[in-house]
A protein has these predicted regions:
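Short helix-coil junctions and helix-kink-helix linkers
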Residues: 167-184
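Short acidic alpha-helical/loop segments enriched in Asp/Glu that coordinate divalent cations
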Residues: 162-170, 201-210
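Short alpha-helical segments that sit at the start of domains
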Residues: 125-163
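Long, low-complexity, charged/polar intrinsically disordered regions in eukaryotic proteins
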Residues: 87-140
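Hydrophobic face of amphipathic alpha-helices
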Residues: 28-81, 85
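A short, conserved structural fragment
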Residues: 186-205
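Short, amphipathic alpha-helical interaction segments positioned at domain boundaries
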Residues: 210-338, 342, 346-362
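Long, low-complexity intrinsically disordered regions enriched in small/polar
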Residues: 1-49
C-alpha cells in the first residue's frame, strides 16, 4: 500500500508511504465556558453514581479533560465550536469525557480529546463521522496490548519509499510498540475481533509477507554493495578525482548535477558506494523528470551489478535495528495473524496512533487502494 508522501531528490518529489487564545466566542455565541458546561451537563447523570474518594477523583479527571479539550479547540477547531450545540456532538462529548473519567490514563485523555476535535471538524453523516463515533465507543475497551497490536498490524501493511535515513527513522519510530510485542496473547487477538476492529478470513491470507513487501519496495536499500569495477567506472565517467579524502569535480560541471549525484550516492567511504534512497523506480522516475538520463543509467548499472538481499538477510536487518523485531516477525507469521484483517474503524484507530509514533500523516485511503 502506498500513500503519496513526497520524497525530495534535489527538488524532485518521489517519496511515498505505502497508509488542537483566550476565551472563544463565535457566531453561534458559544464560549469556552459554555463547552465546559455542556460537557459537565451531559455526564452529570453518570457522575452521580460515585461516592467519596471516587467522586473527587472523577471530578478531577473531568476537569482535566475539559482543560485539554478547550486548549485543543482553541488551537485547532475554533471555528467549529458552535457544533457543540448539536445533540450528536454532545453525545460524542459525553462518551469521550466518560471514557477518560473511567480510565484516568493520560494517553486516553489525549486520544479522546483528539477524537472529539476531529469529530467537531468533520461533516455530519459522513463515513468519517461514523468512524469517529465508533472509535470513541471502542477505545475505552482496548487494553494497551490490544491497541499496540492493532497499531503494529496497520504498520506492517505499509511500505515507505524515501531516503534511507528517513526509512530508518520510520522503522525506529515504532520501537515502543516492539518493546512490548512479546506480551501479545491469543486473547488480545481474539478481543480485537470482538471489539469490531478486525476480522478473520479463515482459510485465506495474503501471499506476500511484511518482509516480501519491504524487499520489493526498498529494492535499492536491500542490496549488497557493488563490485569495485562499478565504482571505478562511475568515478571515471563523471571525472571525479580524490585528493586527501576530498572529491574534486571536473571544471565546468553543472552545480545542479553535482548536488544531485551527492544527493543520491553516498561516496564518503570510498571505494564503497551506497545509495541514499530506498526505491529503484521512484529514484529513476524523479531523475528522468529532471532530465538526468545519464544518472538514471548509473542507477541501472548499480541495480544490475548488485545482488538483492535474501528474505533472511532482510529479517536480520530489522533484528539488528531492534532485537524485539524477532518477536514481531514471529508474530506476523502466526496463522491467526496472517488471516487477520483490519476493519475500517480498526484502520482509523491505528492510523491515529501511527501518526503519533512516526510523525507521518497517514490517510485511510492508502488501505483501500
Amino acid at each position: 500500500m502506498q500513500n503519496k508522501d513526497e520524497q525530495q531528490i534535489s527538488g524532485v518529489s518521489n517519496s511515498t508511504i505505502n497508509q488542537a487564545k483566550g476565551n472563544i466566542i463565535n457566531n453561534y455565541g458559544i464560549s469556552a465556558k459554555d463547552v465546559i458546561d455542556i460537557v459537565n451537563s451531559v455526564v452529570a447523570d453518570k457522575m452521580s453514581v460515585f461516592h467519596k474518594e471516587a467522586e473527587e477523583t472523577a471530578k478531577q479527571r473531568l476537569t482535566e479533560f475539559n482543560r485539554e479539550l478547550i486548549k485543543k479547540l482553541q488551537d485547532k477547531a475554533e471555528e467549529q465550536i458552535g457544533k457543540f450545540n448539536s445533540p450528536a456532538l454532545q453525545l460524542a462529548a459525553r462518551k469521550a469525557a466518560w471514557g477518560y473519567v473511567q480510565s484516568g490514563d493520560t494517553n486516553d485523555k489525549e486520544n479522546f480529546v483528539d477524537l472529539l476535535i476531529e469529530r467537531v471538524s468533520v461533516e455530519e453523516k459522513s463515513t468519517k463521522q461514523h468512524l469517529i463515533d465508533e472509535a470513541i465507543e471502542i477505545l475505552p475497551s482496548l487494553s494497551p496490548n490490544c491497541l499496540q497490536l492493532l497499531t503494529f498490524l496497520a504498520f506492517s501493511q505499509l511500505m515507505k519509499q524515501s531516503k534511507i535515513s528517513e526509512y530508518e527513522n520510520w522503522i525506529n519510530s515504532i520501537n515502543p510498540i516492539l518493546d512490548n510485542i512479546s506480551k501479545v496473547t491469543s486473547l488480545d487477538i481474539d478481543f480485537l475481533n470482538q471489539a469490531n476492529c478486525t476480522f478473520n478470513t479463515v482459510g485465506f491470507h495474503s501471499s506476500n509477507s511484511f518482509i516480501d513487501n519491504q524487499l520489493k519496495s526498498c529494492d535499492l536499500l536491500f542490496r549488497h554493495k557493488p563490485p569495485r569495477n562499478f565504482v571505478d567506472k562511475f568515478f571515471a565517467k563523471h571525472q571525479i578525482t580524490r585528493q586527501d579524502n576530498t572529491y574534486l569535480w571536473p571544471a565546468g560541471e553543472s552545480f545542479d548535477k553535482i548536488m544531485t549525484l551527492n544527493e543520491i550516492f553516498d561516496l564518503v567511504n570510498y571505494p564503497e558506494i551506497k545509495m541514499k534512497y530506498t526505491t529503484f523506480s521512484s529514484v529513476c522516475d524523479g531523475l528522468a523528470k529532471r532530465g538526468f538520463s545519464d544518472i538514471v543509467d548509473d542507477i541501472h548499472d548499480y541495480y544490475n551489478q548488485t545482488q538483492p538481499y535474501t528474505k533472511e538477510e532482510v529479517e536480520q536487518y530489522f533484528i539488528a535495528k531492534n532485537p524485539h523485531w524477532q518477536d514481531a516477525l514471529s508474530l506476523l507469521k502466526r496463522e491467526g495473524i496472517r488471516s487477520l484483517r483490519l476493519k475500517p474503524v480498526g484502520v482509523y484507530i491505528a492510523c491515529r496512533q501511527l501518526v503519533k509514533f512516526t510523525g507521518d500523516e497517514l490517510s485511510l485511503d492508502i488501505y483501500y487502494k
